[in-house]
């Protein structure tokens, strides 16, 4: 089954996920937060009806206070670390943090964490988004001949910080140094 006629009422982060899980509009009723105990997730309904569900994601908010209880509604899940301010790389690892090129760019601990996380994601193959999609493709290959399953490949990007590796920046003549990446 292909879902190609779905419209979200809440575009930001966790409110949009709650809509995907419950089919209920979240906007104007509730802010950023977890699924509630009374929420009925589509993935639990799928399980009750014999459909196996799997999540591949690099969305670290699933493991934070206020964002939890989504990923455990799937039968199984894989999470890939290192997006945004994900507390992945230890604080004592030095990272080169460029000067703030725009007053619109965010500053502070989550930016510092982002640059520390990049020390583990130097190549495209190491990027959490690449690893997320690769895991989803592996799942598809392993389950292509099977029936009654649902796969969700959920990439955090596009999401601030808008980090673009230099080889892609060069394709469009963009400056080597990042300018506005975290408004």
Please annotate each region the language model reported.
Residues 1-183:
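Catalytic domains that recognize anionic headgroups
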